[in-house]
Swiss-Prot record:
Transcription regulation in keyword set: yes
Protein name: Tegument protein UL47 homolog
Species: Equine herpesvirus 1 (strain Ab4p) (EHV-1)
Domain notes: The nuclear export signal is CRM1-dependent.
InterPro entries linked to this entry: Herpes_UL47
Subunit details: Interacts with US3 kinase. Interacts with UL31 and UL34; these interactions seem important for efficient virion nuclear egress. Interacts with UL41/VHS.
């Protein structure tokens, strides 16, 4: 044979491509030698998981070694004519076609299962398969049926500390296969495998999985041992896995709010101390002039101009009106019988800690007659209240629970949060998983303390609520004065210049100071951070979870009780949709969803400021010797709350400015998440306005017990609203910093949120961005749910879709503005602005790499991605 051609025998020399078997049968079962040349390669959009293509890593490695060894005739496996003749006349056995390595980021996690509903309902209809297609789909799908048909049905209890099954190591095996690819021989076929691996790496770059070094907080040396135990799960027996996970759950519980290892700072942070010292000096005083101390016989007389400016009454949410009409068993404070002597014996009739030494018990409960809230709530009453919550109609049509004791059915395994093809649709599998995750994040911590320890009564929550609400009012007193002096010193330089967020807000703030004569009990010079006890740590945590406690809602009595339930349910729905649309493997949202999230964050933050000013004035009125003076006109008049949301012209104009934006109007109607967020916002707006109306009606010669109950109900709603804003902000900031998405936000939203979070510190422990995503992944792991990119696989593609946009939303938008400008600021890049709030929003423990992707994107105007996914 010609020496120039050697073993090739004169055949043309060319670089061989991947075999036709691999290209046309990427998912064919191992060992199938039948050739099929007409079947095209399917993309990831067809929902193939590649499970049958994966084999044991050791077996694959051995096969690769055998295929890379030269044959006995020293002839290469060529696809040319000469190569075909050589194989016919040689003694070599043809090598079996090898399936390509499965993509590690697309294969479903081990143990993935479907819920019973997913097994009953099929996904999108599939075209009939011919004989060739059936061969290609061998062992991958059953023709005309779901691949999840034989999965076992699991009904996990959400609060289980000892899981019955452990995670499989299939995902880790994929990682070993990837690592092993670099050790293969440098043959031509191996070069093709490396090219395919590079393509897979480019695909994986499209989704940024959060792997920041600050993702787990260092606690003690024991924490490292727990992490090592986690890493050893894949190589352990089933019993060892269960013991390891139980040990970690027990360890983490010690550092949960209220646990023995949970640390609470006893004094305000250095940032808060510096904020108050730099903004107000000991010699600073506010002198107010006017007739504010005169008796006001007709509070509405000052608001007649509103009637001419706003011609239409405020629209209330139709679902709220339906809820009120269906509330057939109201319970009012005047109907409650309680024994004062018994309450004194139980040491319940005592002054809250915030006013110890300032007011005795008799004087305090005369000003705030709230002893009826300590009356016993029976188990039957609590059950009926929880049942009323569950029976409320949700947007997605599934039952929502307000307590851990009720079962939540969901599918373990992969969680897929990609957008659906249907408008206003969402994957039902992800929705059910999000319902379980929301309960674990926002309810389980409180319900564990209440039910498992069986040591906490709703009395403790009532005491915490009134104490925290009074401390919050005192923080409003301080913040309002800091803003006044920030405006006065806005042109100062050096050490005398106030903090920049205070200067930015000082000209547009709604926190207005009260006259010193009516706010003596609220006066303070530093921010109050609230009680520091185990119970208070639990009540302050979990994004404002007290509203989920049925006994506490009932204790406040109507009208506060029904409004708290209404708000809690619809905000829970909003958070379920937020969790069902993003996770750490896919932290981004669609453009329309981001527009809606920013609009709700801006409006709800302004609404929180309006409500806190109302709390400030109402608290001063309840504690005042004379509650009919003009200084309290803001909460005594009824006309403002009949014409404007929460009785605020500023909020009215802000809603018109934001909701009339064409982009916001499109976003509101196009996605399910946007629908849930807007209905949640309008639910809070309606309930708070209704409570303020009831307060103004009862304050004029009505029941003082009802006035106190409404005041506490507003506080309970505000705790839940502030927690929801914390939740929403962390999701939006994660999309900007971890997902690298371009998000424009009003420039005054983050300064306003940061200040209000400091004001509400006695009521709510805010969670930083890093803590939020870390805790979220840990809880998903506890639920045996694995975040996965891309759409769900075949059989799990059931979509829950809203048929039409809600008719309620357009009617809730104001028809015109009253004044020019709502004080929201200009639009700025969120990723850049967040860098000024690393301590308050991102988290003190965050490294400098947090937000790097968002900043790179912000600098060039597009997402910093190395490659694009193949379609």
């Amino acid at each position: 044979m010609d020496q120039h051609h050697g073993a090739r025998g004169g055949a043309p020399i060319r670089r061989p491509r991947r075999s036709i078997e691999s290209r046309s049968h990427p998912f064919r079962a191992t060992g199938n030698t039948q050739r099929t040349y007409s079947t095209p390669r399917l993309s990831y959009r067809d929902g193939l998981s590649g499970r049958t293509a994966s084999r044991d890593p050791q077996e694959q490695a051995s096969n690769q070694d055998e295929s890379s060894n030269p044959s006995t005739s020293n002839a290469q496996q060529s696809t040319s004519f000469w190569g075909y003749l050589r194989r016919v006349f040689s003694d070599d056995v043809p090598a079996q076609p090898q399936a390509p390595r499965p993509r590690a980021d697309f294969a479903p996690p081990a143990g993935e299962e479907s819920s019973s509903e997913e097994e009953e309902e099929e996904g999108p209809a599939q075209a009939p398969l011919d004989e060739e297609d059936q061969l290609m789909y061998a062992d991958q799908y059953s023709v005309g049926d779901s691949s999840d048909e034989n999965d076992e049905e699991e009904d996990p209890r959400l609060g289980s500390d000892y899981p019955t099954s452990a995670e499989s190591s299939e995902y880790h095996d994929h990682g070993e296969m990837v690592a092993g690819a670099g050790a293969e021989s440098e043959s031509e076929t191996d070069i093709d495998a490396e090219e395919e691996e590079e393509d897979d790496e480019d695909d994986e770059d499209d989704m940024e999985v959060i792997r920041d070094e600050s993702y787990r907080l260092p606690r003690t040396w024991l924490d490292k041992s727990i992490r090592l135990m986690d890493e050893a799960l894949a190589q352990s027996s089933e019993l060892s896995k269960a013991i390891t996970k139980s040990t970690r759950s027990l360890y983490d519980s010690q550092f949960a709010p209220g646990g023995r290892g949970y640390t609470q700072t006893a004094t305000p942070s250095r940032r808060l101390v510096q904020l108050s010292r730099a903004g107000m000096y000991d010699s600073d005083k506010i002198v107010m002039t006017g007739d504010y101390m005169e008796v006001d016989d007709d509070p509405d007389s000052a608001y007649q101009s509103w009637v001419r400016a706003i011609r239409h009454p405020l629209a209330m949410n139709p679902s709220w009106e339906e809820t009120i009409s269906n509330h057939t068993n109201p319970s009012f404070s005047t109907d409650i019988d309680y024994d004062i002597d018994e309450l004194i014996e139980k040491n319940l009739a005592r002054t809250p800690p915030v006013f110890e030494g300032l007011l005795d018990s008799a004087e305090f409960f005369y000003k705030l007659p709230m002893l009826y809230t300590y009356a016993t709530i029976t188990q039957d009453e609590a059950y009926e209240e929880r049942l009323a919550w569950s029976n409320t109609q949700a947007l997605h049509g599934h039952e929502q629970s307000s307590w851990q004791a009720l079962l939540v059915y969901y599918s373990r395994g992969g969680m897929y949060v990609s957008p659906t093809q249907e408008p206003r649709g969402i994957w039902r599998r992800a929705l059910k998983q999000a319902m379980a995750l929301q309960l674990k994040m926002c309810v389980l911590g409180l319900s564990d303390v209440v039910t498992k320890q069986n040591a906490t009564h709703h009395h403790a929550a009532v005491t915490f609520l009134v104490d925290a609400l009074l401390r919050t009012a005192r923080n409003c007193y301080l913040a309002s004065r800091l803003l006044v002096f920030a405006w006065e010193r806005r042109r100062e330089t050096g050490a005398k210049r106030p903090a920049e967020p205070l200067i930015a807000l000082s000209g547009v703030t709604l926190l207005q100071p009260l006259p010193p004569e009516v706010s003596e009990l609220l006066e303070q010079r530093t921010f109050d951070i609230g009680l520091r006890t185990p119970n208070s740590a639990v009540f302050r945590a979990f994004f404002g979870s007290l509203v989920y406690w049925a006994e506490l809602r009932l204790a406040l009595r109507d009208p506060a009780s029904i409004n708290c339930r209404y708000v809690g349910f619809h905000l829970q729905t909003s958070e379920i949709y937020l969790l069902a649309r993003a996770h750490s493997a896919s932290p981004g949202y669609t453009k329309e969803e981001l527009v809606a999230m920013e609009a709700i964050l801006t409006l709800a933050t302004l609404m929180l400021e309006v409500a806190l000013q109302w709390v400030h004035v109402a608290c001063a009125q309840l504690l005042s010797e004379n509650d009919t003076i003009k200084a309290f006109r803001r909460v005594s008049a009824s006309i403002p709350h009949a014409l404007a949301p929460l009785g605020s012209i500023r909020l009215h104009d802000a809603e018109f400015e934001v909701l009339s934006n064409p982009d916001v109007m499109v976003a509101r109607d196009e996605t399910a998440l946007s629908q849930a967020l807007f209905l949640g916002y309008f639910s809070v707006r309606t309930a708070l306005t209704a409570c303020m109306r009831d307060y103004s009606h009862e304050a004029d010669g009505g029941s003082k017990e009802t006035v106190t109950g409404v005041f506490l109900g507003v506080g309970l709603i505000l705790q839940r609203l502030a927690g929801h804003l914390n939740f929403l902000l962390n999701c939006l900031a994660g999309a900007a910093l971890y997902g690298g998405q371009k998000i424009n936000i009003h420039s005054l939203t983050l300064p306003r949120y940061s200040l209000l979070a400091d004001v509400m510190a006695p009521m709510l422990q805010r969670q930083s961005l890093v803590d939020f995503w870390r805790a979220r992944d840990n809880m998903l792991e506890d639920l045996e749910i694995t975040p996965r990119p891309g759409p769900p696989t075949q059989g799990k593609r059931v979509v829950v879709e809203m048929p039409l946009p809600s008719d309620d939303l357009p009617d809730m938008t104001p028809g015109a503005s009253v004044n020019n400008g709502a004080g929201l600021g200009r639009m700025v890049d969120m990723a850049k602005q967040l860098q000024h709030y690393r301590e308050t929003i991102i988290g003190e423990e965050a490294t400098s790499s947090v937000g790097k992707r968002g900043l790179i994107r912000a600098g060039v105007g597009v997402a910093a991605l190395r490659g694009r996914r193949r379609k």
